[in-house]
Design a protein with these regions (language model features):
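Solvent-exposed alpha-helical segments and adjacent loops
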Residues: 1-113
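Loop/turn elements at helix/coil->beta-strand transitions in domains of secreted/extracellular proteins
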Residues: 41, 137-141, 167-170, 206-211, ...
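N-terminal module-boundary/linker segments of secreted carbohydrate-active enzymes
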Residues: 101-194, 454-473
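Substrate-binding cleft of secreted/luminal carbohydrate-active enzymes
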Residues: 141-148, 387-473
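Aromatic-lined carbohydrate-recognition surfaces of secreted/lumenal glycan-active proteins
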Residues: 144-146, 282-285, 313-344, 387-398, ...
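Alpha-helical scaffolding within the catalytic cores
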Residues: 153-161, 195-198, 267, 334-351, ...
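Aromatic- and acid-rich polysaccharide-binding/catalytic face
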Residues: 172-174, 346-369
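Substrate-binding cleft of extracellular glycoside hydrolase catalytic domains
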Residues: 184-325
Length: 473
């Protein structure tokens, strides 16, 4: 290969160094390999920026799947793009040198890129029709899993699911408060994770996959003592009726931190909207349980606060509507009723039909395969006349096995099948069922492969046919 003389701002490309600090190391290595392959020029890596230019730097925080740029600033080359677009932009930038005539090429000009390769995704309306079709079709069920409560990316859960079952889930759940996407606390050097998450979601939805998001909102009360314990941010109480009124009143002391979190969450959901991704959004889940601060049950001191959740739900709904988040399907998903308090009832906090697109139950069994109380709760939400789902599904604490061998004796996917058999026999309808990560996951329970191979189960490979079916009708 004949080496061309490639100039950027008067400096030869071979004199540049690729800055490989932190998360950018992946991109720096990719750049060096690509340059060597395409031009025969070998670029050195550097752990830090040179003071006087000739750095190649990378910014993978772009939230638009197909967009990015190359900027020449103060003698440096800066590649900006998404997790998807950045490697492609690097190649396209270098292609100009390969395709240009002559032995000396000047690549100093900055350039904006729109690769125009964002996949065409289904619409929110089409998603709703698919769920309605499955809901009305006996013994047909969309299933999937929640991404675990760490900084795991969608691809991590998808790999685990495939390894356990030989197939991919048709629905995937994530949480803005617990999966590494807690925007208020995400440091700048990790914001590339947001771009990666968006791009992986786009790729998943392009195959027909369904994405759901919730949020374990942080307790906004100034006196709530938080510990280092995982998940502690969503516990405690905020007070009586006055505190709840202040929570939905702009500019109050308790409203400000909540609105700040809500704004950042809306920013992320807006990025999904801008990429064409419909989202099942289920805020304030399990509000009737009393274990999260976002509950009408506010402990012995304050008792039950009537209309706490309906008012908060409408506040979130109105704000997200103002933000133009028209890609959301709103799902009301209480816990299965488990107490004598009237506020434990699954319908107690229902905000009204005009604020809800579908409903669900978070259902954790303790080994009784009769339908029992959970079934009665499911019957209640079915009376609302909307698509109903097992929004979260898992086994209770006594059924958690320390190993897979131990789990075999406690709770397996065969038990899940038995529960579903009984539900369908009793006339229940279900749109989707989503297990809840880690040891509450289909992939943790033995016999997942047999479960996913059942005729009733729709996995990711079956989703395109469902969308085609509803488009034909």
């Amino acid at each position: 290969m004949t080496e061309k003389k490639i100039l950027i701002a008067g400096t030869e490309l071979k004199s540049f160094k690729a800055v490989a600090n932190g998360a950018n190391r992946e991109w720096a290595l990719h750049f060096c390999r690509t340059v060597a392959k395409m031009t025969g020029i070998y670029i050195e890596l550097s752990e830090s920026e040179a003071l006087f230019g000739a750095n190649v730097m990378f910014d993978a925080t772009e939230m638009m799947y197909s967009k990015g740029s190359v900027k020449i600033e103060r003698g440096n080359i800066i590649f900006r793009g998404s997790y998807h677009s950045l490697p492609i932009i690097i190649e396209k930038y270098l292609e100009k040198a390969i395709e240009a005539d002559g032995d000396e090429i000047d690549l100093t000009e900055s350039e904006e890129f729109d690769l125009c390769d964002t996949p065409k995704l289904y619409t929110k309306e089409e998603l709703m029709k698919v769920l309605e079709y499955v809901y009305e079709t006996p013994d047909l069920l969309i299933v999937g899993d929640e991404v675990d409560n760490s900084r795991s990316m969608p691809s991590s859960m998808l790999r685990k699911y495939f390894d356990a079952s030989g197939t991919y889930p048709a629905i995937m759940g994530m949480d803005l408060g617990r999966c590494g996407l807690k925007l208020p606390t995400l440091p700048d050097n990790e914001r590339h994770l947001l771009s990666r998450c968006v791009c992986e979601i786009v790729d998943y939805v392009a195959q027909g996959g369904i994405i759901t998001f919730g949020c374990h909102f942080t307790n906004p009360h100034k006196d709530y003592e938080r510990s280092a314990a995982a998940g502690n941010q969503d516990r405690g109480h905020i007070g009586g009726a006055d505190a709840w009124k202040d929570l939905v009143t702009e500019g109050t002391e308790i409203n400000k931190p909540f609105k700040r979190e809500l704004t950042l969450d809306a920013d992320f959901l807006s990025a999904l909207r801008d990429n064409g991704v419909p989202v099942i959004w289920r805020p304030l889940h399990e509000m009737n349980g009393g274990w999260f601060w976002f509950s009408p049950i506010q402990g012995e001191e304050y008792g039950v606060v009537k209309n706490a959740i309906p008012d908060l739900w409408k506040y979130i709904y109105n704000y997200f509507t103002e933000r133009g988040l028209d890609n959301l399907l709103w799902e009301y998903s209480p816990n299965n009723s488990n107490g004598a308090n009237p506020a434990n009832d699954v319908l107690y906090s229902y905000p009204g039909d005009e604020y809800v697109d579908m409903v669900g139950i978070d259902w954790y069994t303790v080994g009784n395969y009769e339908i029992g109380g959970s079934g009665r709760s499911y019957e209640k939400i079915m009376t609302l006349g909307k698509v109903a789902n097992l929004a979260e599904f898992g086994q209770g604490g006594p059924l958690h096995g320390a190993t897979r061998d131990a789990q075999e004796k406690l709770f397996t996917c065969k038990h899940v099948d038995a529960i579903l058999d009984r539900m369908y026999a009793d006339g229940y309808k279900i749109g989707y069922a989503m297990s809840y990560a880690e040891r509450n996951s289909f992939v943790w329970w033995p016999h997942c492969d047999e479960f996913m191979a059942s005729d009733r189960i729709v996995d990711l490979s079956g989703m395109p046919a469902l969308f085609e079916k509803i488009r034909e009708n």
